[in-house]
Design a protein with these regions (language model features):
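Conserved active-site-proximal phosphate/metal-binding subdomains
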Residues: 50, 58-98, 104-181
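Active-site entrance/lid segments in N-terminal catalytic domains of soluble metabolic enzymes
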Residues: 1-93
C-alpha cells in the first residue's frame, strides 16, 4: 500500500519554490480494508485525504492486489459487494472513487456508475491503440490472444498477475532465470 506517498510528494513539492498547487494523489486499493488503512493513515500522519481512489478489481490485467486464493474464490456478486462497500466508504469521506479492473464495455462502465462510482479506469483496452507506444509485436499479442491464453502468474513481487501465455512465461515456469547480479 502507498502509505507514505503524501510524504514523498510533500518533500518534492517543498523543494519547488513558487509552486502554487499540490500534486493530486490517488492510491489504488483492492479491498475495503485497504481503503480504510490508506485513508486513516494519510489523514492521521499527513492530514491529507486522497484526491480520489482507484478501486481495482480482481479481473484487472497485470499486477493484482489479491492473493491467489482470493482470485480463485472470486465471484461477480462477491466483488460487487466489495466495490459497493468501497464506494460507500469513499463517499462518507467525500472522496470520489474510480472503479477499475475487468471493465470491458459500456455495460460494465454503466454498471459501475450505477453502483455509485465517480468514473472508471481502463488500461488494457488501450494497449493496442495507435496512441500507445508499445511495440507492434506486443500489441499483436493482445489482438491474437484467446481467453484460454490469459493466465495467472506469480509476479516478481510475489503477488499474482494476469498475463498472456507466451514463450517467456514458459521459460520462467521451467525455472529459467533472467535476472543477474
Amino acid at each position: 500500500l502507498p502509505l507514505d506517498l503524501p510524504g514523498v510528494v510533500a518533500e518534492t513539492e517543498n523543494g519547488m519554490p513558487g509552486r502554487s498547487h499540490r500534486t493530486m494523489l490517488a492510491p489504488i486499493v483492492s479491498s475495503p480494508r485497504a481503503l480504510s488503512v490508506v485513508t486513516k493513515y494519510w489523514m492521521k500522519k499527513y492530514d491529507r485525504k486522497p484526491d480520489f481512489i482507484v478501486a481495482e478489481g480482481p479481473l484487472a490485467g497485470g499486477h493484482l492486489g489479491f492473493k491467489r486464493e482470493e482470485l480463485d474464490a472470486y465471484t461477480p456478486e462477491n466483488y460487487e459487494r466489495e466495490l459497493t462497500a468501497m464506494i460507500r466508504q469513499a463517499a462518507e469521506l467525500g472522496i470520489p472513487l474510480i472503479a477499475a479492473g475487468g471493465i470491458y464495455d459500456r455495460r460494465d462502465l454503466e454498471h459501475c456508475l450505477s453502483l455509485g462510482a465517480a468514473g472508471v479506469q481502463l488500461g488494457t483496452r488501450f494497449v493496442t491503440t495507435e496512441e500507445c507506444d508499445a511495440a507492434e509485436a506486443y500489441k499483436q499479442a493482445y489482438l491474437s490472444a484467446r481467453k484460454e491464453d490469459i493466465v495467472i502468474v506469480k509476479s516478481p513481487v510475489g503477488m499474482p498477475g494476469r498475463a498472456i501465455q507466451n514463450a517467456f512465461l514458459e521459460k520462467v515456469a521451467a525455472g529459467e532465470r533472467f535476472m543477474t547480479g
